[in-house]
């Protein structure tokens, strides 16, 4: 009650929709110690936000660099600014405007064939009527000028993922390069790894991965910076290793890992997004997503030699292992979550690899990694329990989901076959025959990959392990669909969410396909 308040020039702010600022409402000198606030009202007490109030040890959000526009194109009743890179942050507006002049900045990743900004992929509602309403305000920062000279405005309580900005409310004389500056922001994490070679496509793909990793790191890994901005667990798990190789993220991982453990339900289950307001326990999770619980501390241990996260999370490990044992069907298999998401040229949930295969294999890998971590901190009873759980899942897959006549994993597809090899479902003496079957599956697709995100995480590593790194490289960089090179050929400055032959994708800034950067370092360079 000792705090005083007054109407703010920030008239609206939202994490996803944007910020509105009316400079005419500014109070000169309000932040100075000698300012007279006697005319202001006392603050009103309000309930604390849900969640635990504690010091955040993750790196803060910081300005990383600034970008000037590459081009400015008249479009409709405004001007389209192209910054050439799809990153995350805000625009700094510098303008000499008139009092009451209203300037709108609409942010987007892509342009339509007619040259106008495409925001149709940034949907918030399945209800078309609600979307038609919200797209009039989504991703927009609005500034109302004070007048009387040069004004500078940078939004404070929002950020956007974008390459393009459509500016309306300015004159042609005001639509100059100095009007907008792209202020690129993300967590203040250091870049520690890198890769460059003689192949321009490889170099561009490495840059795309780095750009998507950074654009999607705001205290913790998010799925995309323009639409959901959620901490999807599988996205972070799929990228955990390559991010640790390339970026110093261990402090941020440690902080987010505490949130992951706090989000765990009493029965041991995890939600698909963290933090969550309660959503994600009944859909959007499962072993391939929940593996973030094991992967973050495991890879921090492998690459940084630290065991603090393991010790802090040991109780959550045990709860989750017990939870898995309660979710098996009568055959001992798991079929409870999301599977090989975003399979090439399919709807995201139209899996080729059977869900019972990917779920049970991922549960095996989770238990196996937890066994290693328990051993690292001397928790022998817990280690033995994790070993028993892992062995049970592995044996179940071997007994029920492998055709031993042809050494083919269930689904007879690249994802299942590569996962069975990579995660050691096949024993060493069986892997040669299993790999031959994988090569046949690749040949059936004309030498191109045909996987979702779970398959892409392992396929190229398996090919390199068996002396087929050149084939893997061709599959990655080739310009023909499907390939990462296809994205580059179609102008991608960051990693996309989907491989679609028509180039249409829900997001053009997703990091969960980014393990190719670790493949470049681990397998291509040796």
What label would you give each PLM region?
Residues 1-227, 235, 251-254, 271-278, ...:
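Extracellular/oxidizing-compartment recognition motifs
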Residues 231-526:
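Active-site core of glycosidic bond-cleaving carbohydrate-active enzymes
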């Amino acid at each position: 009650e000792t705090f005083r308040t007054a109407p703010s020039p920030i008239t609206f702010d939202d994490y996803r929709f944007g910020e509105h600022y009316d400079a005419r409402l500014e109070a000169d000198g309000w932040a100075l110690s000698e300012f007279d606030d006697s005319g202001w009202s006392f603050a009103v007490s309000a309930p604390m936000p849900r969640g635990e109030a504690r010091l955040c040890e993750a790196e803060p959000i910081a300005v990383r660099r600034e970008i000037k526009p590459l081009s400015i194109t008249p479009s409709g009743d405004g001007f389209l600014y192209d910054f050439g890179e799809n990153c995350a942050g805000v625009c700094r507006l510098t303008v000499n405007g008139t009092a009451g002049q209203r300037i709108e900045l609409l942010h987007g990743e892509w342009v339509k064939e007619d040259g106008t900004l495409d925001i149709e992929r940034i949907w918030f509602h399945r209800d078309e009527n609600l979307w038609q309403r919200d797209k009039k305000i989504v991703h927009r920062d609005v500034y109302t000028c004070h007048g009387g000279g040069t004004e500078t405005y940078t939004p404070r309580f929002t950020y956007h993922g974008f390459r393009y900005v459509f500016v309306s409310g300015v004159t042609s004389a005001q639509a100059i390069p100095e009007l907008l500056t792209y202020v690129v922001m993300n967590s203040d994490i250091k870049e520690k790894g890198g890769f460059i070679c003689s192949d321009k496509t490889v170099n561009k793909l490495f840059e795309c991965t780095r750009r998507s990793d950074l654009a999607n790191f705001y205290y913790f890994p998010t799925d995309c910076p323009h639409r959901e901005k959620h901490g999807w667990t599988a996205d972070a798990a799929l990228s955990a290793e390559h991010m640790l190789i390339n970026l110093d993220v261990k402090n941020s991982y440690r902080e987010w890992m505490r949130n992951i453990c706090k989000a765990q339900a009493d029965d041991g289950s995890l939600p698909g997004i963290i933090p969550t307001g309660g959503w994600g326990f009944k859909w959007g999770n499962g072993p391939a997503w929940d593996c973030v619980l094991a992967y973050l501390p495991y890879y921090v241990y492998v690459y940084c030699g630290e065991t603090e996260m393991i010790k802090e999370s040991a109780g959550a490990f045990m709860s989750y292992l017990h939870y898995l044992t309660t979710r098996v069907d009568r055959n001992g298999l798991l079929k409870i979550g999301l599977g090989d998401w975003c399979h090439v040229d399919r709807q995201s949930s139209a899996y080729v690899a059977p869900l019972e295969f990917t779920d049970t294999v991922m549960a095996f890998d989770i238990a196996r990694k937890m066994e290693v971590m328990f051993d690292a901190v001397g928790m022998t009873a817990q280690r033995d329990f994790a070993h028993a759980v892992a062995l049970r899942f592995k044996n179940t897959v071997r007994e029920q989901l492998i055709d031993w006549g042809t050494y083919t994993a269930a689904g007879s597809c690249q994802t299942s076959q590569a996962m069975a090899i990579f995660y050691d479902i096949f024993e060493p003496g069986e892997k040669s025959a299993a790999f031959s079957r994988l090569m046949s599956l690749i040949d059936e697709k004309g030498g191109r990959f045909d996987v979702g995100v779970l398959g892409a995480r392992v396929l190229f590593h398996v090919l390199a392990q068996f002396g087929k790194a050149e084939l893997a490289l061709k599959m990655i960089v080739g310009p023909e669909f499907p390939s990462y090179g296809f994205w580059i050929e179609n102008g991608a400055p960051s990693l996309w969410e989907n491989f679609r032959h028509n180039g249409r994708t829900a997001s053009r800034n997703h990091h969960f396909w980014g393990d190719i950067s670790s493949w470049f370092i681990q397998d291509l360079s040796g």
